[in-house]
Amino acid sequence: MTNIRKTHPLMKIVNNAFIDLPAPSNISSWWNFGSLLGVCLILQILTGLFLAMHYTADTATAFSSVTHICRDVNYGWIIRYMHANGASMFFICLFMHVGRGLYYGSYTFLETWNVGVILLFATMATAFMGYCLPWGQMSFWGATVITNLLSAIPYIGTNLVEWIWGGFSVDKATLTRFFAFHFILPFIIAALAMVHLLFLHETGSNSPTGISSDADEIPFRPYYTIKDILGALLLIMGLMLLVLFSPDLLGDPDNYTPANPLNTPPHIKPEWYFLFAYAILRSIPNKLGGVLALVLSILILSLHTLIHTSKQRSMMFRPISQCLFWILVADLLTLTWIGGQPVEHPYIIIGQLASILYFTLILVLMPVASTIGNNLLKW
């Protein structure tokens, strides 16, 4: 008798995606982050659902409803901090996942990669709107500053900003719609993740060498299910260490002050995972130029498929490209540090140099290094 998992219409889909899926035998722990992102998304949806049961999206009561969750709701504090720090874990996994894709040339899977870039944008939008919901000082001023960037768009900018605000400033209408979008977007992200997997399973996974693995593949279960469970346990352990020992480590103290439109905080900055993009935005004196650089800093990921000049897919056997990749990682860490610093000397010039280096590395140095690598191998 044929196994039900191979014949049942629903079980068959799960079987082909997670059980009998042929996977390369040599994929390393860098391939764990896809499943970890799935774990993070489920965790965020569940904790978010329980928070939404007690949260009120109204300027008068939003801040006190978050306080109520932490003080009066059974285990409300742990749900709240798991959700807040879960977002940080989500972005750590996202950056690792994207970094692995860049290093091993996964961007040559065009559809999978571009759906991934859309997923990154959707996740960033969700995180930004979620940060606005507690209605603390940094929530309010962060929402004001970031939405105001759209006013840099010629002709329609001001109208667009007021349309998003639902008035002439960030107020009740803005908070209500941000809550609505913050609630619906994770489900859209989940649907996009399925599309992402669908395209991935059309081609099969990439491997560290970047060459076809058709000759040497193993079933996904039990080998990679066990590996993914280990990764998930380590992720949850790391998250719980953060939640139980230093829940406010990655947050901003200003967000424990209720939002006040009449009092601007001395340093307005987003959450740590947006600081690299914020530093690029701030390093350009022109408003429209800054906004374009901000968008391009993420959108540039889609260009990798066009500017890949190497005859090899992975960086595994390309030492010059490897060196440039790690310089890029160091540059992004520098930008993250600069984004959290005040706008004064020497941070301004460091930010500008790091921003120039970021775009130069991706658009000029990496393609040149790949061409040099080809010539050295006489290809």
Curated annotation (Swiss-Prot):
In terms of InterPro entries, this protein maps to:
Cyt_b/b6_C (IPR005798), Cyt_b/b6_C_sf (IPR036150), Cyt_b/b6_N (IPR005797), Cytb/b6-like_sf (IPR027387), Cytochrome_b (IPR030689), Cytochrome_b_C_euk/bac (IPR048260), Cytochrome_b_N_euk/bac (IPR048259), Di-haem_cyt_TM (IPR016174)
Q: Does the keyword Methyltransferase apply?
A: no
Q: What else is known?
A: Heme 1 (or BL or b562) is low-potential and absorbs at about 562 nm, and heme 2 (or BH or b566) is high-potential and absorbs at about 566 nm.
Report the co-factor binding details: Binds 2 heme b groups non-covalently.
Protein name from the UniProt record: Cytochrome b
Query: What organism does the record attribute this protein to?
Result: Madoqua guentheri
* Gene from which the chain derives: MT-CYB
Family recorded in the similarity comment: Belongs to the cytochrome b family.
Which pairs of Cys residues are joined through disulfide bonds in the record? none
Q: Where is heme b b562 annotated to bind? A: 83, 182
Q: Does the keyword Electron transport apply?
A: yes
Instruction: Report the record's Gene Ontology biological process terms.
Output: mitochondrial electron transport, ubiquinol to cytochrome c
